[in-house]
């Protein structure tokens, strides 16, 4: 082992002394398979899940990378649809180190009308670390919001701004990026949420490689590796980006990565881009093939916001135009965007020629610090949807088979509703 690797492992081991002995987080849960992320369980570990007295052994896939420490993913297969399972992670002596629960997705097609469901979307998560936080500031707070989100019993949670904002000192270190995410999962308030509901990670600037970086910055490989070690997402699409898709009931989710291929270069034939050709082409092809009523496109940067700053997808003007034109040309119905990357929340309604309005739900800080006043001139913002306090979003899909609808709602740290708006599926099918 090289000196460099020895030092990294020593750093991880030292940091682990202040963490709980074992951490778990439910990852991707499908109809017949489920994934559970774990950390701090030693080199010899086993995983089981049970339902109705039947036990399933999990295949263990250990994380790779210098900073991985004792993390990995347990994959449970051969499960039954729409079933509640309890899982446990055990050491080599058989002692249960951590446990939790999950419910597999429904298998309704050709059997029943699509089931109603709701899921959570989270913005910036900031777990305070005084040693590395900006001086004279306490950026994070109201951690009871995790319990408020858990009380809504989401079918799953989407972390649209990552799990924990990186500090300046983290940006040049793979192990620091990894540990920043691990620390966020050690809070007592968050454990009940992440160990009992599925969680999907999104590549987000704040937690991927730092807000001011792009793919041309140093240590992009470290950022990619740390992300992989921290999540139990579905398999990423080919091409290097962290994009993936999954289905739930009559909805399909296309989770994009606007970090790996993000480039701000604007010179000669080069123009700023966030997705890259391969990822953009995959998205368009996948949307065209999808038979789902609702097609949720998830990315860190708001799509509908027209202000061309680096915080918004509008800064990648060419890609935005290509995708917008394609959605009209190919007559893709039911598309809804979900985003974050803002110190406030809002719902945008993008009016476009030839097709129905595109809705973009942008979630503000979950535990990060929100702004007191919104100054950005987003003229597509839905009236009364501005949220300038810590909050989370719940997206509900419900209604009879011939009259489905999606409802966007924001909630505060106590679980109180701040805003709600419902859009009928029929409105998301109109083309000129």
Place the predicted regions along the sequence by residue.
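N-terminal compositionally biased, intrinsically disordered segments and leader/signal-like regions
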Residues: 3, 18, 49-51
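Bacterial N-terminal signal peptides
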Residues: 9-17
């Amino acid at each position: 082992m090289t000196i460099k690797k020895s030092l990294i492992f020593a750093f991880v081991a030292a940091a682990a002394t202040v963490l709980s002995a074992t951490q778990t987080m439910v990852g991707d849960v499908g109809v017949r398979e489920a994934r559970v992320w774990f950390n701090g369980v030693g080199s010899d570990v086993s995983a089981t899940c049970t339902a109705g007295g039947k036990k399933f052994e999990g295949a263990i896939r250990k994380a790779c990378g210098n900073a991985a420490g004792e993390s990995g993913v347990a994959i449970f297969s051969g499960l039954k649809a729409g079933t509640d399972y309890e899982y446990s992670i055990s050491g080599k002596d058989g002692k249960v180190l951590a446990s939790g629960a999950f419910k597999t997705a429904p298998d309704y097609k050709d059997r029943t009308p699509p089931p109603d469901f709701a899921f959570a979307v989270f913005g910036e998560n900031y777990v305070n670390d005084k040693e590395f936080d900006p001086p004279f500031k306490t950026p994070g707070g109201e951690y009871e919001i995790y319990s408020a989100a858990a009380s809504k019993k989401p079918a799953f949670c989407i972390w649209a701004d990552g799990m924990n904002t990186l500090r300046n000192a983290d940006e040049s270190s793979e192990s620091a990026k990894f540990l920043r995410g691990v620390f966020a999962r050690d809070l007592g308030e968050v454990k009940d949420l992440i160990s009992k509901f599925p969680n999907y990670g999104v590549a987000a600037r704040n937690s991927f490689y730092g807000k001011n970086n792009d793919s041309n910055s140093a240590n992009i490989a470290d950022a990619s590796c740390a992300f992989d070690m921290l999540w139990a997402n579905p398999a990423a699409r080919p091409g290097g980006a962290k994009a993936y898709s999954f289905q739930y009931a009559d909805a399909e989710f296309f989770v994009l990565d606007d970090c790996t291929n993000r480039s701000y270069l604007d010179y000669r034939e080069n123009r700023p881009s966030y997705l890259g050709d391969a990822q953009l082409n995959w998205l368009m092809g996948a949307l065209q093939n999808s038979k789902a009523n609702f097609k949720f496109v998830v990315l860190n940067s708001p799509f509908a916001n027209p202000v061309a700053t680096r915080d918004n997808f509008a800064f990648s003007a060419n890609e935005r135009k290509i995708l917008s034109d394609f959605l009209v040309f190919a007559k893709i119905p039911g598309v809804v965007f979900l985003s974050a990357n803002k110190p406030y929340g809002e719902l945008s309604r993008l009016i476009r020629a030839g097709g129905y309005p595109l809705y973009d739900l942008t979630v503000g800080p979950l535990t990060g610090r929100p702004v007191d006043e919104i100054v950005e001139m987003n003229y597509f913002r839905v009236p009364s949807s501005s949220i300038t306090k810590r909050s989370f979003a719940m997206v509900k899909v419900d209604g009879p088979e011939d009259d489905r609808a999606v409802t966007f709602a924001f909630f505060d740290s106590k679980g109180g509703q701040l805003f709600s708006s419902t859009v009928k599926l029929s409105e998301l099918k109109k083309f000129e």
